[in-house]
Curated annotation (Swiss-Prot):
Record's subunit section: Homodimer. Interacts with the adapter protein MST50. Interacts with TRX2.
UniProt function note: Mitogen-activated protein kinase kinase; part of the MST11-MST7-PMK1 MAP kinase (MAPK) cascade that is essential for appressorium formation, penetration and invasive growth. The MST11-MST7-PMK1 MAP kinase cascade transduces signals from the cell surface sensors MDB2 and SHO1 that recognize various surface signals such as surface hydrophobicity, cutin monomers, and rice leaf waxes. MST7 acts as the upstream MAPKK that directly phosphorylates MAP kinase PMK1.
Source organism, top-level taxon: Eukaryota
Keyword Transferase included in the entry's annotation: yes
Gene deletion effect: Produces much less aerial hyphae and conidia and shows weakened cell walls and higher sensitivity to cell wall-degrading enzymes. Impairs the formation of appressoria and the ability to infect rice plants.
Keyword tRNA-binding: no
Name of this chain's protein: Mitogen-activated protein kinase kinae MST7
Organism: Pyricularia oryzae (strain 70-15 / ATCC MYA-4617 / FGSC 8958)
Region (Disordered), start-end ranges: 1-37, 363-409
Keywords: ATP-binding, Kinase, Nucleotide-binding, Serine/threonine-protein kinase, Transferase, Virulence
Protein encoded by which gene: MST7
Effect seen on changing S212D: Leads to constitutive activity
Family: Belongs to the protein kinase superfamily. STE Ser/Thr protein kinase family. MAP kinase kinase subfamily.
Pfam families membership: Pkinase (PF00069)
């Protein structure tokens, strides 16, 4: 059986005739948020990081819009003018000498060899005139799962299974093939694009970068395993704790630890964070609330991930290969592209700046030809685990459930 995590071959045929310096670059896109999969050329350009090491220069990156910022830096959607490739550019402010920053950039180049369907494509890294570290990577037009959860609420259980499968697949690939631990698993570092692909970003490939910015990301510490908060050694099982916490957050629509509810977005008092970290270390691990929305095998998986003693936790590979919830998720067909379309369509209603789906695409999503046909043209909310999980056999499928009960039944399979 072929190794599912074997790196993709570097000998790829350049079917689109891509060149680093084309004679006539394509004009910039007219729609700022055009879905990736609607342009086959763009899909091919996204593979360019696999075929080439781009000679990235600041003057070749045209900013389309800012995506976010934090203590550690900023992220923008940009267009690489020579290749007309849309990218996500991350500017990281590093407090270090220039030689150390150069070393960080060199360490980041290993990301060129990380070729997996579960990992964002890396285009390159360099230092700008301010000696900031600049990283360019694949742009995910739907966004992070943190944003999806905040805007749309709890994620339904069949999609949650695919998120678990992709996240564990990415963690297993990184460690098995490159001996890299992610070190920062959380919903904001799990991205989704309009093709329905779920991918990891911001993994700990550069030890120097981790050391340089570790003190600037206070929020990340809330996803740290108890052993890391206490200063003990980081292992791949520390990633498993963060994975379990993230999956629970996406399932219930909020951060699982109760102390987090006492922290407002504007509050920066160290006492609030310290109380939360104390709870993570000393209080019992959170559990999924009792609900028909959550199959027992999901509860069991999360419980295994949140054992306080790391020796009791499984590895990402053990979960990916043998956990009943993940195996059931692998067997459950889910149209993630349609799910992603639904999220973007909801966003389109909220902003006149966002592109609208073409009539042909909307008709396709409404038609019975679509595998699950859950797209709605009206304002009905997206299904959540609690609204679409159970079906009364006397009444048949709930309105809008679109076969979700059948998919959840598959998630109960334990063999």
């Amino acid at each position: 059986m072929a190794d599912p995590f074997a790196p993709r071959t570097m000998k790829r045929r350049n079917v689109k005739g891509l060149a680093l310096t084309p004679a006539a670059p394509k004009p910039p896109p007219t729609a700022e948020n055009a879905p990736i999969h609607r342009d086959s050329d763009q899909h091919a350009q996204l593979e360019i990081g696999i075929e080439f090491n781009l000679d990235l220069r600041p003057e070749d990156l045209e900013v389309i819009k800012d995506l976010g910022s934090g203590n550690g830096g900023t992220v923008s959607k940009v267009r690489h003018i020579p290749t007309n490739t849309v990218m996500a550019r991350k500017v990281i402010h590093v407090e270090a000498k220039r030689e150390m920053r150069k070393r960080i950039v060199r360490e980041l180049q290993i990301m060129h060899s990380c070729n997996s369907e579960y990992i964002v494509t890396f285009y390159g890294a360099f230092l700008n005139e301010n000696n900031d570290v600049i990283m360019c990577m694949e742009y995910a037009d739907v966004g992070s799962l943190d944003r999806v959860s905040r805007v749309f609420g709890p994620i339904r259980v069949d999609v949650l299974g695919k998120i678990a499968e992709a996240t564990l697949g990415g963690l297993t690939y990184l460690y098995a093939k490159h001996h890299i631990m992610h070190r920062d698993i959380k919903p904001s570092n799990i991205l989704v694009n309009s093709r329905g692909s779920i991918k990891l970003c911001d993994f700990g490939v550069s030890g120097e970068l981790i050391n340089s910015i570790a003190d600037t990301f206070v929020g990340t510490s809330t996803y740290m395993a108890p052993e890391r908060i206490q200063g003990e050694k980081y292992t791949v099982k520390s990633d498993v704790w963060s994975f379990g916490l993230s999956i629970m957050e996406l399932a219930i629509g909020k951060f699982p630890f109760a102390a987090s509810e006492q922290l407002s977005d504007a509050e920066s008092a160290p006492a609030g964070i310290l109380d939360l970290l104390q709870q993570i270390v000393h209080e019992p691990a959170p559990k999924l609330p009792k609900s028909d929305a959550f199959p027992q095998i999901l509860e069991d998986m999360i419980q295994k991930c949140l054992y306080k003693n790391p020796d009791d936790r499984p590895t990402p590979e053990e979960l990916f290969e043998r956990d009943p919830f993940v195996q059931a998720a692998k067997r459950t067909p889910v149209d993630l592209r349609e799910w992603a379309f639904g999220l973007m369509e909801r966003d389109n209603r909220k902003s006149h700046l966002a592109p609208q789906l073409s009539p042909a695409t909307a008709d396709l999503l409404r038609s019975s030809d679509s595998p699950t046909a859950t797209y709605h043209g009206d304002d009905r909310p997206l299904e959540t685990p609690t609204s679409a999980y159970r079906v009364d056999p006397r009444r048949g499928p709930a309105e809008g459930s679109a076969g979700l009960a059948d998919q959840v039944d598959r998630l109960y399979i334990r063999d």
